[in-house]
Design a protein with these regions (language model features):
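Metallo-beta-lactamase
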Residues: 33, 40-41, 132, 139-182
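Short acidic/glycine-enriched loop/turn segments that link adjacent beta-strands
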Residues: 10, 21, 149-151
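Pre-active-site segment of Zn-dependent metallo-hydrolases
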Residues: 15-60
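Active-site HxH/HxHxD metal-binding segment of metal-dependent hydrolases
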Residues: 41-133, 171
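Short, exposed beta-strand/loop patches in secreted or surface proteins that constitute
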Residues: 3-8
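Short, hydrophobic/aromatic-rich segments at coil-to-beta transitions
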Residues: 9-15, 130, 139-141
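Divalent metal-coordination and catalytic microenvironments
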Residues: 12, 27, 37, 49, ...
Length: 182
């Protein structure tokens, strides 16, 4: 059975660790919460989030890759930049998801019932630069950061000056794949 680990980063922000080294973040305002990324889609991330907050949750996807967006099927309100629809569909294929998981050290703990069905990106709300998400007492601003994918987005938590980058900027950001902008 897949379990997630969570660590409080600040009063508003909790970092959630997935089994494939992916990181997700729960940002809580006074009225609602935003989950940034949903990981690989093995095990119920939604159950973990419900233990962390009783507020309504929206999901903001930094991009459509297998390790960032495949758990979105558990959630009602999901935002993604639709420039990533094609890569989301490709990475949502069962074979790609299981291959990605096999790279994880915890692969032996996963059973088929842990598999979360891939969502239809057509049901996601569009996400674009300039979108603002007021969570009550704190706001997430959306910025385009195309490169890693054609729809990569980052989110700034104004009040704490925390920038959530997904894979837009790190030591392993791939910029040479078919879906990257190079």
């Amino acid at each position: 059975m897949v379990t997630y680990k969570a660590v409080k980063v600040s009063d508003r922000v909790t970092r959630i660790f997935g089994i494939c080294t992916e990181l997700m973040y729960l940002v809580e305002g006074e009225d609602k919460a935003a989950l940034i990324d949903t990981g690989s889609g093995f095990g119920s991330l939604k159950q973990t989030v419900e233990k962390l907050t009783d507020k309504p949750v929206i999901v903001l996807l930094t991009h459509g890759h297998v390790d960032h967006a495949m758990g979105a099927g558990e959630f009602e309100t999901v935002y993604m930049n639709h420039n990533d629809d094609d890569i989301f569909k490709k990475h949502g294929q069962s074979s790609i998801r299981w291959d990605s998981l096999r790279m994880s050290e915890e692969y032996v703990e996963v059973v088929s019932s842990d598999y979360i069905e891939t969502a239809d990106a057509g049901r996601f709300y569009p996400l674009k630069e300039g979108d603002r998400f007021d969570l009550g007492g704190c706001t997430l601003n959306t910025y385009a950061c195309y490169g890693h994918t054609r729809g990569s987005m980052v989110f700034l938590l104004e009040e704490e000056r925390i920038l959530f980058l997904g894979d837009a900027c790190n030591s392993r950001t791939f910029m040479f794949q078919d879906y990257s902008l190079t």
